[in-house]
C-alpha cells in the first residue's frame, strides 16, 4: 500500500481486506482504482480550491469531478485534511458556475484552452460550453452530501449562494427555452451529436410544461429531444436538497420556497410528460421527450441515467413504472444495450457500437436488489479491465482488451463505490 495515501484511506483499504479476505483480488483492484484519483487527477490550488482533471483530458468537468471524489466522502467523515480537499473542490465548482453556468468543463486557469473553437459565448476559463442540466446538479448534490457526511457547513458561503442564484435562474429560463434562453451552441465539421440543430437552439420543445431543457446529455452528446428525463429527475432531487440546506442555514426563505416549488413542478411534469406505454410491458419512463408527444426510448451509460434513478435518489410516483423501465433498458429493446461473449450491458452513442461502459455496469450493481447481483457486477468489471488493473470508458463486448480511454477516473470511482457499498460502506444521504 502506498504510504502517500491519507491514513484514513489506508485504514479503509485495510478494513476492506479484512471483509474480503477470501477475495483479495477485489481489494487489489479497489486499491489501484481508489488511489489513482488522488495520485493522478487532483491538484490543490494556491487559493485553497481543488482542481480535478477527468483523466486523459486536461480539464475539469463539473460532473466527473464530483463522481471522482464522491467515494472519499466515507473516509472524510473522520479525516479533516481529506475533507478540506473535498471542500476545495466544491469551492472550485461554484467559482466555475459563477463564471458561466452554461459551461460543462473548465480550465485550471484563464488560459484560453478549449476542446474546439465553438460558436457560443466562450471565455478563457472555459474548456467546453455544452449546457447540461447535470453539470449544475452535481455540485449541489456534492455540497449536500459533504454536509451530511462530515457535518461541515463552511461550503455554504457567498460563492455557493451566488452560484445557487445562477443555477435557479438557468433552470427557470430553460423551462421556457424557446422564448427566453440566451444559449446556443454550434460546432463546425463534426458529428451531429456534437452540435445543436436550428442555428444552435436544438430541436424544438414545448415550453412552459414544467420540464427543464438541456442541450446535451451527460455523455456530452446532444439531446435528440431537449427534455432529458433522467437529468430532470436529478434536478428534482437536488432542488429538494437545496431546500433542506436553505432551511438549515436560515435567512434563505425565498430560495427555499423557490427550490421547493420548482422541485414539485418538475416532478409533476416528469410524471405527466415523461412516461409512455409499451405494449406487453406497461408504462415506462422515456429517456427524452419534446412535450409535443415524441419520445426517445433508450438509456445511456452516463449518469444521470434511467438505470441510475434510485442511485440518484429520485422517488417515482409508481414503482411499477420504474421497474418496467429497468426491464426495458436492460434488454435489447434499448438500442444501446449490447450482449457479447465477455460482457453485456448498456453502452452509449458516444462510443462505438457493441461497447459497454464500466460506469453502467457499476450502476447496475449499485442499484441491484441483491448482494449476489452486486458481487456478480464486481467480478464482471474486474474480468473486463483489459489487463490494466483499472476501469475504462467503453469496452468491446467480445474482447475486453479493446476499449476506449485508458485513463478514465470517473469509471474507477464508480467501481470503488460499488465495492464499498457491497462491504457496507454507504455514503450518508
Each language-model region and where it sits:
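Low-complexity, Ser/Thr/Pro/Gly-enriched N-terminal "stalk/linker" regions
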Residues: 1-63, 88
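Long, acidic, intrinsically disordered low-complexity segments
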Residues: 1-27, 89, 167-170, 175-190, ...
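Well-ordered alpha-helical scaffold segments within catalytic/enzyme domains
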Residues: 8-22, 67-80, 138-153, 233-252, ...
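Hydrophobic core segments within long, regular secondary-structure runs in both alpha-
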Residues: 10-13, 27-35, 69, 73, ...
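Active-site-adjacent bridging/hinge elements
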Residues: 36-47, 111-119, 205-217, 387-393
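Aromatic-rich carbohydrate-recognition surfaces in CAZymes
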Residues: 58-86, 90-194, 408-425
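Extended ligand-binding clefts on enzyme/binding-domain cores
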Residues: 62, 101-102, 109, 115, ...
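C-terminal capping/lid segments that line or modulate ligand- or cofactor-binding pockets
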Residues: 117-124, 129-132, 296-316, 354-429
Amino acid at each position: 500500500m502506498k504510504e502517500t495515501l491519507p491514513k484514513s484511506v489506508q485504514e479503509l483499504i485495510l478494513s476492506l481486506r479484512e471483509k474480503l479476505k477470501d477475495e483479495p483480488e477485489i481489494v487489489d483492484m479497489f486499491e489501484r482504482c481508489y488511489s489513482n484519483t488522488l495520485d493522478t487527477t487532483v491538484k490543490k490550488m494556491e487559493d485553497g480550491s481543488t482542481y480535478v482533471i477527468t483523466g486523459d483530458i486536461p480539464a475539469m468537468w463539473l460532473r466527473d469531478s464530483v463522481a471522482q471524489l464522491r467515494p472519499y466522502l466515507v473516509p472524510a467523515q473522520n479525516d479533516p485534511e481529506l475533507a478540506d480537499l473535498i471542500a476545495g473542490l466544491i469551492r472550485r465548482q461554484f467559482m466555475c458556475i459563477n463564471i458561466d453556468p452554461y459551461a460543462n468543463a473548465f480550465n485550471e486557469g484563464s488560459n484560453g484552452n478549449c476542446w474546439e473553437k465553438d460558436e457560443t459565448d466562450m471565455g478563457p476559463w472555459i474548456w467546453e460550453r455544452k449546457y447540461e442540466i447535470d453539470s449544475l446538479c452535481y455540485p449541489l448534490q456534492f455540497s449536500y452530501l459533504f454536509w451530511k457526511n462530515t457535518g461541515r457547513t463552511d461550503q455554504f458561503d457567498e460563492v455557493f449562494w451566488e452560484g445557487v442564484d445562477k443555477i435557479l435562474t438557468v433552470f427557470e429560463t430553460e423551462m421556457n427555452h424557446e422564448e427566453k434562453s440566451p444559449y446556443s451552441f454550434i460546432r463546425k465539421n463534426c458529428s451531429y451529436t456534437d452540435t445543436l440543430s436550428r442555428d444552435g437552439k436544438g430541436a424544438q420543445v414545448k415550453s412552459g410544461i414544467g420540464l427543464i431543457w438541456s442541450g446535451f446529455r451527460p455523455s456530452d452528446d446532444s439531446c435528440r429531444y431537449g427534455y432529458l428525463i433522467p437529468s430532470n429527475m436529478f434536478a428534482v432531487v437536488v432542488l429538494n436538497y437545496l431546500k433542506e440546506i436553505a432551511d438549515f442555514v436560515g435567512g434563505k426563505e425565498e430560495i427555499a420556497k423557490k427550490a421547493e416549488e420548482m422541485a414539485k413542478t418538475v416532478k409533476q411534469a416528469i410524471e405527466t410528460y415523461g412516461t409512455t406505454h409499451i405494449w406487453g410491458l406497461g408504462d415506462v419512463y422515456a429517456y427524452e421527450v419534446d412535450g409535443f408527444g415524441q419520445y426517445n426510448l433508450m438509456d445511456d451509460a452516463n449518469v444521470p441515467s434511467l438505470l441510475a434513478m434510485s442511485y440518484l435518489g429520485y422517488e417515482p410516483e409508481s414503482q411499477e413504472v420504474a421497474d418496467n423501465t429497468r426491464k426495458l433498458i436492460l434488454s435489447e429493446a434499448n438500442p444501446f444495450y449490447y450482449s457479447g461473449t465477455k460482457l453485456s450491458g448498456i453502452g452509449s452513442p458516444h462510443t462505438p457500437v457493441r461497447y459497454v461502459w464500466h460506469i453502467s455496469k457499476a450502476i447496475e450493481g449499485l442499484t441491484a436488489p441483491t448482494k449476489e447481483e452486486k458481487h456478480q457486477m464486481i467480478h464482471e468489471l474486474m474480468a473486463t479491465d483489459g489487463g490494466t488493473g483499472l476501469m475504462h470508458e467503453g469496452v468491446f463486448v467480445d474482447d475486453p482488451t479493446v476499449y476506449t480511454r485508458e485513463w478514465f477516473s470517473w469509471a474507477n470511482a464508480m467501481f470503488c463505490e460499488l465495492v464499498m457499498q457491497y462491504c457496507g460502506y454507504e455514503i450518508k444521504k
